[in-house]
Amino acid sequence: MVPVLKKYKAAAVNAEPGWFDLQESVRRTIHWIDEAGKAGCKLIAFPELWIPGYPYWAWKVNYQESLPLLKKYRENSLPSDSDEMRRIREAAKANKIWVSLGYSELDLASLYTTQIMISPAGDVINHRRKIKATHVERLVFGDGTGDTTESVMDTEIGRIGHLNCWENMNPFLKAYAASLGEQVHIAAWPLYPGKETLKYPDPYTNVAEANADLVTPAYAIETGSFTLAPWQTITAEGIKLNTPPGKELEDPNIYNGNGRIFGPDGQNLVPHPDKDFQGLLFVDIDLDEIHLTKSLADFGGHYMRPDLIRLLVDTNRKDLVVHEDRVNGGVAYTRTIDRVGLSAPLDASATEAQSESV
């Protein structure tokens, strides 16, 4: 698809989520969508696990301390086929805006680190899950499967992609995105401590500065794409909500001020936000600015040697239980996006919801 709109305004969220509170999380999501719409944006990008906030407490507590927090976190995670999701999709439609949303997806009895792309019509055109939860995140989240791997999609505002956290550092996922001609990327980040918290032998890659100012611009350079990096922030009240009784309360400022937006050549395009900034970072995107960057190094095209190096990608769903297709033979698969109820157009979803309420 040739982009219909090559020049437009986009926004990256740099704000605090509604910790452990699904309804407050949805309220804040709609608020920022509305704000981006009022500002004339065609795209808004939310951080990783924006709903109901990143479980950063998992890095701070032992097993027993984690249990009350984990229970509350699960109770406030977002089912994809829900009234809350419909309200978010309706907000996207009302503002005629593309929305990249990161959330803790409750699917049956498991949680997944999920991103969706909502179109200006309120339809979900991409549903993906983080392919591998990072370190202690594996105590909370499962892994994505083949058909939740796709990250890049053709839209009227260009080939847009999104990945979660350290997926933006994964060379294989970057190579796959480059092969699809990605033009605008959303590097969605969670809540991250600053370098002042670093203690040997914890690697420098595990602090905010490394990911905001090294990993993210590297993604922009290697893929030749505009790269928006939305980040979560936290206040003193948020620290209290994420800290078990008896634990010392941290200074929230060590976690804040990390939102970034980079051009396709890796240049920083917006001032770094202040530690107390809660809001949107804006950028004017011009897809034609990508031409010269990719003319020098297009790793998905002229600057690669597929006769020497190739990447095998399996986008087939892997099910615990499969059913025989007795009509056509073989095995019948249901796409994840269909099974979780996100593939139906918004208008159809609304009609179905009204029928159920009668």
Curated annotation (Swiss-Prot):
Residues 8-287 form the CN hydrolase domain. InterPro entries: C-N_Hydrolase, C-N_Hydrolase_sf, CN_hydrolase, Nitrilase/CN_hydratase_CS, Nitrilases_CHs. CDD domains: nitrilases_CHs (cd07564). The active site is at E48, K130, C165. Keywords: Hydrolase, Lyase. GO terms for molecular function: cyanide hydratase activity; nitrilase activity. Induction: By cyanide. It catalyses: formamide = hydrogen cyanide + H2O. Its EC number is 4.2.1.66. It is an enzyme of class 4 (lyase). Signal peptide: none annotated. GO terms for biological process: cyanide catabolic process. Catalyzes the hydration of cyanide to formamide. Degradation of cyanide may be important for plant pathogenic fungi in infection of cyanogenic plants. Oligomer of dimers, forming left-handed helical fibers. Belongs to the carbon-nitrogen hydrolase superfamily. Nitrilase family. HAMAP family: CN_hydrolase. PANTHER family: CYANIDE HYDRATASE (PTHR46044:SF4), NITRILASE (PTHR46044). This is Cyanide hydratase. It comes from Penicillium rubens (strain ATCC 28089 / DSM 1075 / NRRL 1951 / Wisconsin 54-1255). The lineage of its organism: Eukaryota, Fungi, Dikarya, Ascomycota, Pezizomycotina.
